[in-house]
């Protein structure tokens, strides 16, 4: 464990004023007004881990079909206008895109872990793509 420098601190000395103690006791004994219960919150990371397990078990497509279809058609227009797609072709494209993204994020996570981090950053994606031999 790293050592830390000790610094002198002024001691306040004496006891706390009586007013503070009296107000604390009054707050404890007084009934709570409103009765509004705070919503339950999980610890940070708990929900994320639950979602990771859920999505690793599932096999359904995670990108919505219509937005993906619009994106494919928009990109295809740059190459040739009035292209038509079979629905199975768009489905196959979406399957391959999602498989590619999942494997890219797996490699990206390994790059972040190698750098002793738990948060992925853009430089991890760049390194993963560079190691795969992808450019552009």
UniProtKB/Swiss-Prot annotation:
The modification N6,N6-dimethyllysine is found at residues 5, 15, 28, 37, 80. InterPro entries: Histone-fold (IPR009072), Histone_H2A/H2B/H3 (IPR007125), Histone_H3/CENP-A (IPR000164). The modification N6-methyllysine is found at residues 5, 10, 19, 24, 28, 37, 80. The modification Phosphoserine is found at residue 11. It comes from the Eukaryota. The nucleosome is a histone octamer containing two molecules each of H2A, H2B, H3 and H4 assembled in one H3-H4 heterotetramer and two H2A-H2B heterodimers. The octamer wraps approximately 147 bp of DNA. The modification N6-acetyllysine is found at residues 10, 15, 19, 24, 28, 37, 57, 65. It is found in: Nucleus; Chromosome. The keyword Phosphoprotein applies. Core component of nucleosome. Nucleosomes wrap and compact DNA into chromatin, limiting DNA accessibility to the cellular machineries which require DNA as a template. Histones thereby play a central role in transcription regulation, DNA repair, DNA replication and chromosomal stability. DNA accessibility is regulated via a complex set of post-translational modifications of histones, also called histone code, and nucleosome remodeling. It comes from Phaeosphaeria nodorum (strain SN15 / ATCC MYA-4574 / FGSC 10173). GO terms for biological process: rRNA transcription. SMART domains: H3. GO terms for cellular component: nucleosome; nucleus. CDD domains: HFD_H3. The gene is HHT1. The keyword Methyltransferase does not apply. This is Histone H3.
């Amino acid at each position: 464990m790293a050592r830390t420098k000790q610094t002198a601190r002024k001691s306040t000395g004496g006891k706390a004023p009586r007013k503070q103690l009296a107000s604390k006791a009054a707050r404890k004994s007084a009934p709570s007004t409103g009765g509004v219960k705070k919503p339950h919150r999980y610890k940070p990371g708990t929900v994320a881990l639950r979602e990771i397990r859920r999505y690793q078990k599932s096999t359904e497509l995670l990108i919505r079909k219509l937005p993906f279809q619009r994106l494919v058609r928009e990109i295809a227009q740059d190459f040739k206008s009035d292209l038509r797609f079979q629905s199975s072709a768009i489905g196959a494209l979406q399957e391959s895109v999602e498989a590619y993204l999942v494997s890219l994020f797996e490699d990206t996570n390994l790059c972040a872990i190698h750098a002793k981090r738990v948060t992925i950053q853009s430089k991890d994606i760049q390194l993963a793509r560079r190691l795969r031999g992808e450019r552009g």
